[in-house]
Structures are given as C-alpha cells and as structure tokens.
C-alpha cells in the first residue's frame, strides 16, 4: 500500500465514526429522551391507549431493529455490486426522510412507518457497511481501527441525549427532532459524497491478498461456528438493546424515581463509558487473541447485570459502569471476529446475516421488556431480570465459540 493510501485510510476511519455517530445516534441511541414526551402526548391526544403505552415504545424500537437486520442483508448484496458510496448515500436519504416523517406523526402507524425507514437506513449506513468499509482499508491494526470506528455508535448515544433533553424541555420533541435531522443533510451526506472511496490500487500488502480470501455466505452457514456465533450475537444484543433503549424509562419509574434530566445523563454516561470499552477491546484484540478478550468482556457484562436484581438509584452506577465497558468490548469483537472467522470474501453478506440475527435477539428483548413492564403497571423491575438472564447465556455462548474455534484450529494442524 502506497504512503498516500496509508494516510487516507484514517480519513475513512473518521468518516465511518461520523456515519455511526449520526446514524445510530439518531435512529437508536439518541432517541430515548424522546420516548416519554412522545408517549405522554400520544396518550393525551388519544392516539394510543395508556394501557399499552410501554408496548408502543417497545414496538417502535423493535421495528427499527428488525428492519435494520433485513436491510443489512439487502445492503450487503448492494455493496458487492454497487460499492459503498452509493449505498451509504441511500442510507442518508432513508434516515433523513424517516426522521422528518416521525417529527410530524400523530398516530402509532405513522411512527411505526417512520421507524421502519430509520431502521432500513442502518443497513446502508450503519455498523455493517462501516465495518466492511474499514476492513477494506486495514489488515494490520484492524482491531484498533474497528475499535475507534465503533465508538461512533456510543458517541452518538452519548451526545444526542445531552443535546436533545434541554431542547425538548424548551421547544418540544417535534422541533428538536427536525433540528437534529439537519445533521444528516448538512454534514453526513456531503461527507460521504465527497470523501468515501475504496482502495484503488492493488499491492502485495496482506490487506489486498486477504480481501478475496475466506468463505462464501453459503459455506459459512454450514459451519457450527457460525450458528454459535449467531446465538451469541442474539444473546448479547438482548441486554444491549434493552439497556440502551428502556433503561432510561426504568430510571424514571416510581420505584427508582430519578428526573428526566438525570435519566438522560445516565443514558449518555452508558454510551460514553462504552467508548472506553470499545477502544480498549479493539486495542487488546491486536495484542492478544480476540476471542479471549471477548470472553472477558462478556463475563464483565454478566457480572454487572447482577446489580439489576436489586437496582436502586444509589447503586445504579455499579451497574452502568462495568456493563458499559463489557458491552462496548463485546460489541466491537463480534464485528472483528466475524471477519477473522469467516474471512473477507463475502464479509458484507455475512455481516448482514449476523446483523439480522442480532436484531432478532434485540427485538425479542424489547418486546418482552415492554410487555412485562405493562403487566406490572409500568414497573420495569421484573422486566430487567431478563437482562441478567440473557447476559449469563451470552457469556456461556462466548465459551462455546472459544471451544469451537479452538477445535477448528486443532483440526487445521
């Protein structure tokens, strides 16, 4: 790789961070501060019944996740045929359009349609395409690069609630959503249009040789390792999704009783702390075996989730701090290990399928959590026991992956 391309790959990293910060921040991580005012307004105008208000919020988030999984498969197919830039520009259009529709919604059906568009955008501009983009530019130091890139999801989740909460309090949720949508059209779309490109020169660098090595998606799905990996991804995303989307509502429930501003700060802290987990895990995975690092991160996530068995306002930080580090690291290593285990020959398609499995686990988690909260009068205590159970199963799944990968290496000798 010539010196110019070695430098430009860090421009690609910056664009990927920006893409994830805006796309995941506006479609997923930054939305929880909007939930309470949306819920209250829709109940007040009769758009939804108060008895299923929590389910309405959970369904909205579930739609985003489920559609993002389906669109990730489609996005992987388009990437292999059209390249990354046009696919990512389409993602901007879907995201910006979905947010504008949502800001004008006055019925549950319109909200669901808007969240569907926002979810579809993630298959074209979210984690999977950004991982593919960066993986094309990096071989040596790929774990560190991905660790940096995937902090974008946390940066968006940390920054947007801090900006949105005071704006919502002063101007209302609709104006705030329109204002935040401008970042898609004025910043992200031009940056992708003018700066995103793929490596143009072939060299003898390992990154160029490895780009065509690995399994097809058909070969990957016939291995036990793929399905163990998929099960782990689904189990990991159950607690990640529920905590990132519904923990803010748990904190504001009568049992915990914190203010909306304090809950928004806790939400931002969750994402901000996960930045350290993502960067640390990415760096460690370049120095030690990545699967060992992921086992450690998933163990930390499970240990933190035990605090949920007796959560109070006073001990909530004992959950948030280690859980954020653990989930941030596990999230990064799922993306890295997909390329390590199955190669980069059809990594876009493979990541698309894995994303679909991930969001299925997330959607199940959101659905169960919202349902149990409604059944208990808005109390999330029992609903969040599911986070502890899923975290325990995710840890066991990482041990299974470790064993299967070790066996595959032994058979290759």
Identify the function of each model-found stretch.
Residues 116-151, 343:
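Cytoplasmic helix-loop-helix junction between adjacent transmembrane helices
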Residues 28-38, 218, 224-281, 365, ...:
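Extracytoplasmic gate region of multi-pass secondary transporters
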């Amino acid at each position: 790789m010539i010196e110019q391309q070695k430098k430009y790959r860090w421009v690609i990293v910056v664009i990927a961070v920006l893409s994830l910060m805006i796309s995941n921040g506006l479609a997923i991580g930054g939305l929880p501060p909007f939930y309470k005012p949306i819920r209250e307004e829709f109940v007040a105008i009769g758009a939804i019944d108060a008895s299923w208000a929590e389910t309405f919020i959970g369904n909205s988030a579930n739609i985003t996740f489920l559609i993002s999984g389906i669109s990730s498969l489609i996005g992987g197919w388009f990437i292999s045929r059209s390249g990354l830039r046009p696919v990512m520009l389409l993602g901007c259009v879907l995201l910006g359009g979905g947010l504008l529709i949502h800001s004008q919604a006055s019925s549950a059906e319109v909200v669901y349609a808007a969240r569907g568009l926002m979810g579809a955008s993630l298959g074209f501009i979210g984690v999977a395409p950004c991982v593919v983009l960066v993986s094309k530019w990096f071989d040596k130091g790929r774990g560190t690069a991905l660790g940096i890139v995937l902090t974008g999801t946390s940066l968006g989740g940390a920054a947007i609630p801090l900006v949105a909460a005071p704006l919502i309090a002063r101007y209302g949720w609709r104006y705030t959503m329109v204002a935040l949508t401008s970042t898609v059209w004025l910043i992200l779309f031009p940056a992708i249009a003018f700066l995103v490109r793929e490596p143009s020169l072939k060299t003898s660098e390992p990154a160029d040789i490895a780009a065509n090595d690995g399994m097809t998606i058909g070969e990957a799905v016939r291995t036990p390792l793929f399905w163990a990996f998929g099960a782990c991804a689904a189990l990991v995303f159950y607690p990640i999704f529920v905590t990132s989307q519904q923990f803010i509502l748990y904190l504001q429930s009568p049992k915990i009783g914190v203010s909306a501003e304090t809950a928004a700060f806790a939400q931002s802290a969750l994402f901000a702390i996960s930045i350290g987990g993502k960067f640390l895990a990415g760096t460690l995975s370049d120095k030690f075996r990545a699967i060992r690092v992921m086992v450690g991160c998933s163990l930390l996530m499970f240990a933190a989730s035990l605090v949920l068995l007796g959560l109070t306002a006073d001990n909530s930080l004992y959950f948030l701090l280690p859980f954020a580090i653990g989930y941030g690291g596990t999230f990064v290593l799922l993306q890295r290990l997909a390329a390590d285990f199955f190669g980069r020959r059809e990594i876009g398609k493979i990541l698309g399928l894995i994303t679909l499995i991930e969001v299925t686990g997330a959607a199940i988690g959101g659905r169960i959590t919202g349902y149990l909260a409604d059944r208990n009068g808005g109390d999330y205590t029992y609903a969040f026991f599911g986070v502890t159970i899923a975290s325990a199963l995710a840890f066991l799944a990482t041990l299974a992956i470790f064993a299967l990968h070790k066996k595959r290496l032994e058979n290759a000798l």
